[in-house]
Amino acid sequence: KAGAMIGSGGLVVMDDKTCMVEVARFFMNFTQNESCGKCVPCREGTKRMLAILERIVNGEGEDGDIEMLLELADTISATALCGLGKTAAFPVVSTIKSFRDEYEAHIYQKRCPAGACQKLKQIYIVPELCKGCSKCSRICPVTAISGKVKEPFVIDQSKCIKCGACIESCPFHAIKEA
């Protein structure tokens, strides 16, 4: 439905659990690896675009990143010497055009609407549902969950590695992922 250009000669079907920013990062990584490196726009431009996309999917995106990606895309497309370089930025431009709101959510709200970007996931305990059984705390491999028995536990987001072990262990379904 979106009509986003991802590549040439192929059809890619995705659902709402697919992060379009990650898709753009994946294709830019592929392009960067396939670049022969002979022309500066392709070699350096795709490297810079990939670095920006990696920052965005890791929750470190900044104001101006979308505009910088579009500017780099225009420059690379106009100045690259080969077909790969001239089309390298198409997936990024297409995903920004059709899914700009996803880029903005990653950059400004530090969240992935598809829930696919690991670094942007939040695992939390709903205090009203937590019975304080401590099962989650005992199973956490990095001791990110603390609390007192029979009282709601809490997750230290700075320690949490988002493995999901606590979610599976909770018999009261008090641990959620956002």
PLM ranges: what are they?
Residues 24, 73, 88, 95, ...:
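Small-side-chain structural scaffolding
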Residues 27-30, 111-132, 143-162, 173-178:
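Ferredoxin-like iron-sulfur electron-transfer modules
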Residues 11-12, 149, 166:
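Compositionally biased, intrinsically disordered low-complexity regions
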